[in-house]
Design a protein with these regions (language model features):
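Residue-level detector of family-conserved "landmark" positions at structurally sensitive sites
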Residues: 63, 116, 169-170
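Conserved non-catalytic scaffold segment of RNase H-like nuclease domains
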Residues: 1-111, 152, 157-162
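A mobile, often basic/glycine-rich helix-loop segment
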Residues: 111-119
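Acidic, Mg2+-coordinating catalytic module of metal-dependent nucleases/exonucleases
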Residues: 88-93, 97, 101, 105, ...
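Acidic two-metal-ion nuclease catalytic site recognized across multiple nuclease folds
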Residues: 184-231
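Short alpha-helix plus adjacent loop in nuclease-associated cores
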Residues: 118-145
């Protein structure tokens, strides 16, 4: 599996850019085999969103004086990913955020935008897995509450609450490490849920599960509220 995370200049995948990539290749026991981390400088036409830069702990020196260009960062990333071969790409909130940036960034650089779903590759999102885990096994992963008393699934809050402390939050490689540790906890405590979640990591395998099971459960999230459905 490849656990990856991107840090960006903002939330708009159409206009913002990736500034840091962190990725870790693991075996089936979540042990690190190899890793990749790199930063790049701002593209000339990009104005970073201040809050994003504060959260990512990036300085103007990082953004303007880093030797690596944006294209070179993507080129190095793709070279590393290809060397790792076919894999399941797993991130945290990756389907709605990181994957959007990856797909559009590859397209803009004239590369195959569907890296994580072509050539035998698969993709999954640990945020959705943790949400499902909370519905079916609520005591296995501790979920904090925000200031409004609602469940908060932010990685930098969930990880330390579950004993994961040796990682640099809001750093691409640090968040990839935290994602691995949380995935390992779920696999140890609820292996059936972990295995079931990976059965929907491709369109074909998802369709197969739907066709082969007359009854199954899915979870959806609406405005922060997790709702299970029997289908």
């Amino acid at each position: 599996d490849i656990f990856d995370d991107f840090k960006t200049t903002g939330r708009e995948s159409n206009w913002d850019q990736i500034i840091q990539v962190g990725a870790i290749l693991t075996n089936s026991n979540f042990q690190e085999i190899d890793k990749f981390e790199a930063r790049c400088r701002l593209q000339p036409d990009i104005i970073p969103y201040p809050k994003a830069i504060l959260v990512n702990k990036s300085s103007m020196i990082d953004l303007t004086q880093t030797n690596l260009s944006h294209f070179s960062l993507i080129e190095l990333m793709m070279k590393k990913f290809k060397s790792w071969g076919t894999a399941t790409y797993i991130g945290y909130n990756s389907i709605s955020f990181d994957e959007e940036f990856l797909r559009k960034t590859l397209f803009k650089n004239l590369l195959n935008p569907y890296l994580t779903i072509n050539n035998g590759n698969k993709r999954s999102d640990l945020l959705n897995i943790i949400r499902a885990n909370h519905i079916y096994y609520p005591d296995s992963i501790k979920i904090p509450l925000n200031e409004k008393g609602k469940l908060s699934f932010k990685l930098d809050q969930i990880a330390p609450l579950n004993g994961i402390k040796n990682f640099n939050a809001h750093d691409a490689l640090g968040d990839a490490i935290a994602t691995i540790k949380l995935a390992e906890i779920i696999n140890i405590q609820n292996p059936r849920l972990w295995e079931a979640s990976l059965l929907t990591s491709t369109r074909e395998s998802t369709e197969k599960e739907i066709d082969n099971n007359k009854l199954f459960c899915i979870t959806e999230t609406f405005f922060g509220k997790i709702m299970p459905f029997v289908v």
